[in-house]
Amino acid sequence: MKQLLMTAAMQVLSFTAAAQENQTMIVRLAEIEVYPQHLKEYLEFANEVDRLSVEQEPGVVCLYPMQSAEDSTKIRILEIYASEEAYQQHLKTDHFQKYKQGTLHMVKDRKLPTMKPLDPETMKLIFRKQR
């Protein structure tokens, strides 16, 4: 009986910790439109900042740039941060500042809608940093 209660308590604590973690997670699907004449250079900046962020920042779960098949100037970046604090730290990094300052003149339009994960538990199966 004691072991059963301990197991139940551990499951509740585990669930509570996971719920708290998921409440603080930041998920965005950045929508960026780049001027055609700057597309090649923009993609180089984007690939560099995304790679360095995932490699060097523990709180960056995912930065995954994608290009529209219909319009190559439309970029989408799946951004997942472990917390608001991780996102704020990311904004202060040298590699993000290099990207931000280096691409200001290249970006025609930018939207940063925040998304709400429908199944945050599945993220642990997809993203290694969430395990």
Language model: regions and residue ranges:
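Glycine-rich beta-strand-turn "strand-cap" elements at beta-sheet edges
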Residues: L4-L5, Q20-V27, Y64-D71, K100-R131
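Alpha-helix boundary/capping residues
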Residues: Q11, A46-V49, D94, T103-M106, ...
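Short alpha-helical
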Residues: Q37, E48, E70-S72, A82, ...
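N-terminal targeting signals for Sec/Tat export/insertion, comprising classic cleavable signal peptides
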Residues: I26-Q56
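Short, well-ordered beta-strand segments in beta-rich or mixed alpha/beta enzyme
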Residues: M25-E33, C62-L91, K129
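An amphipathic, aromatic/His-enriched active-site/gating alpha helix that lines ligand/cofactor pockets
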Residues: L52-C62, I80-M115
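Hydrophobic h-region of N-terminal signal peptides that target proteins for export
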Residues: A8-A18
